[in-house]
Amino acid sequence: MGMTITEKILAKAAGKACLGPGDNVWVKVDILLTHDVCGPGTIGVFHREFGANARVWNPSGVVIIPDHYIFTADQKAHRNVDTLRSFVKQQGLPYFYDPGTRTYKGVCHVALPEEGHVRPGEVIFGTDSHTCTHGALGAFATGIGNTDAGFILGTGKLLIKVPKTLRFRIEGTIPEYLMAKDIILRIIGDIGFDGASYCAMEFTGEAIRRLSIEERMTICNMAIEAGGKNGIIEPDDKTFAYVQQRSRKPFEAIYGDGNSRVESERVYDAATLEPCVAEPHVPSNYATARSRREVKLDRAYIGSCTGGKLTDFLAAARILRGRKVTIPTFLVPATTEVAEGLIREEIHGKSLVQIFADAGCEDIAPPSCAACLGGPEDTYGRTRSNEAVISTTNRNFPGRMGSKQSRIYLASPLTVAASAVAGHIEDPRDYL
Amino acid sequence: MKTIRGKVYVVRDDIDTDQIIPAQYLNLVPTIPEEYAKLGSYALCGLPDEYPAFVAQGQAKGLYPIIIAGRNFGCGSSREHAPIALGAAGVKAVIAESYARIFFRNAVATGELYPFETPNRLCDNLKTGDEVEIDISASNFKVIGTGAVYPLQELGAVAPVVEAGGIFAYARKSGIIG
Ligand code: SF4
């Protein structure tokens, strides 16, 4: 019996010729990612368990990208970044993207591939549930807690259960009004918020192959919103072009076998999918955008690991060019590379920065997670009361963007931009 | 016979980690003892306002060693702060219809609490304040007021890990690591 791409990557990392869903195996870890929220606790576990003088298993396997609480006066947040700094120094870690320096990047899941730390066929763990993003480049990647991460720091290994695979085949061409966010929100709406619990979500088909790497990241990023262990897309020429621009390290691309067995397969035709939203308070609360035009909005938000990439801002700018927003519209580029892109990229001779300013958006924030997860009181874009927010982020739980009373509608950057102009939920089709 | 007895706190489906420990408290580091205790005092404070407070204002711990939940408890972020906040607030066990994968694993890895699963939809039958007794070895629990006994799914290999106090303690005890 053949194996899926997820099974084959895990088999290689476990040194086994074959394995299947449900097997518990020790895998060798290529990359451990951590950030300012979970890094200090992970370091605490590492020293408590392996001793004050312990050394990490492989300094170049550890990547530390502070991103959550950066632009805040909160003293503990600063202390936490200091804890990372002294650990990096003590251990001689080469990959640390330090706030306040030229190496600072921003949101870890966009920064990790940008900086060349994601390669096809590798095994990546991160102390953040959206680590599943990196399956977009054909790697096995999943989120873990501090204790497991502390174990990896000391040993470079982790015991994991091989997930079953759910396959999603998206065929056809992608209409200009449809984005990756619409595809993944529809899938989550169909299978439910726990519809992929403990499973790998494999995305395949012609429409997936047509997507850019950034759009593929948007899809894999939200596998966790259906409870998935990992999201994954087989690598292709686009993947190799992206990776080879950013990493010199050799890698071995891994593909599923033709006769691999999956738990279920769903097929979609991209041409029939619609711009949509996820209504409060779970990402599986699917509705088409046009069926929710009566929902009045108080603000719009474009940012985060799933919705703050350059392609997301380019999409929003297509709609905002020559128009005005009617509600406060907050913009947070995920990384410094994205922020530079906003200055560099132009549509009809106008930079994205200029387009957003002319449209009346709020001043663009420096790159970080910002209000995607609420954060400390002084966080840019944080909700304060019962605002209705339309957002390109990935979670609409109660209180996720700050106030428990606020209501969050998740949507693609096109839908968010059209809604920011309309002041209510709007289908972007009429704006393109 | 190992048992856990006490009052239950009842929640419903899809209780995510932002409700268990809201993001503004993630600046606290769980391996620092005072901050571990602080996390406990904020446990479940992100629940919608119709829920009663889990930990009373000014208190370090709650009155409820057992949480009864519906489906998909602990969904959302991978923050280990979530099972830790519950453990620090005095929770010894959660009984849910199902868990999000990372929460279940973190609960076991940290040894903070027993994540029991039950085939019954107890969040409709029990109310906050009811007293129950869990019998870990028999994999069931009894509602003290009515005498009703409900089955729990066997924890299997997970039970000794939680009992030891987490994966590191367990791995040392059983000789997996030095
Ligand atoms: S941008 Fe949001 S979802 Fe992404 S890592 Fe930051 S807090 Fe998490």
Predicted regions and their residues:
Chain B
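A generic structural signal for short, non-catalytic loop/turn and secondary-structure boundary residues
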Residues: 1-4, 36, 127, 145
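N-terminal, positively charged, Ser/Thr/Ala/Gly-biased leader segments
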Residues: 1-33, 169-178
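Feature captures the catalytic cores and cofactor-binding loops of soluble hydro-lyases/lyases
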Residues: 10, 26-138
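Conserved phosphate/anionic-ligand binding catalytic regions in large, soluble enzymes, centered on
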Residues: 15-16, 74-81, 162-172
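Short clusters of hydrophobic/aromatic residues that line enzyme substrate/ligand-binding pockets
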Residues: 20, 43, 152
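Generic structural signal for alpha-helix starts
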Residues: 22, 100, 155-156
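Acidic, glycine-rich flexible loop/linker segments
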Residues: 108-178
